[in-house]
Each structure stands twice: as structure tokens, then as C-alpha cells.
Amino acid sequence: MRVVTVYTTNACARCRNAKALLVRRGIAYEEVNLAKDPDGRAELARRTGMVTFPQIVIGELTLGGLDDLLAADRDGRLGELLAA
């Protein structure tokens, strides 16, 4: 299974929702909390080109934010992306 990285910040309801969905699906993830990791913002911009939260990266693929995660979960792509 590919590594899932979730870029978050404090006081972010959409970040909490994304992490909760991953937990419900039994998907392990690494969290990069940019409120605690000031260098993480540059890494986020480099990896994804985005600076909004959350950002979900699966392996080297930037999935996107919460809406993208929900859509991938609904249409079955999430499992495919994890297995690829």
C-alpha cells in the first residue's frame, strides 16, 4: 500500500474530517501539521503546488483536498490509488 500523507493545520475542520475518513477506512497516514512544522509549507508547495488545507498525497500523487478525498472514496478510486 502506498504512503498517505495528510498536510494539515490547527483549527481545521476539513482536516479533521479527512483524517476521520481515513481512520474509518483503516488507512494509515502520516500527518504533517504545518502549524508545528514551519518548513512544511515549502514542502507542501513543492509537492502539490497548493497551500490550502488539507492536502492529501498518496505516494507521489497529489489527490487534493477533502472534496477530492470524498469523491475518490465514493467512486472507488481511493482503494485503487492505494493499491497502485
Indicate where each model-derived feature is located.
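Thioredoxin-like thiol-disulfide oxidoreductase module
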Residues: 33-51, 77, 81-84
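Structural alpha/beta surface segment adjacent to cysteine/selenocysteine redox centers
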Residues: 23-30, 41-53, 57-61, 66-67
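Intrinsically disordered, low-complexity peptide-like regions
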Residues: 8, 15, 31, 35, ...
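Generic alpha-helical hydrophobic packing signal
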Residues: 18, 27-32, 73, 79-82
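Local sequence-structure signature of Cys/Sec-based thiol-disulfide redox active-site neighborhoods
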Residues: 1-28
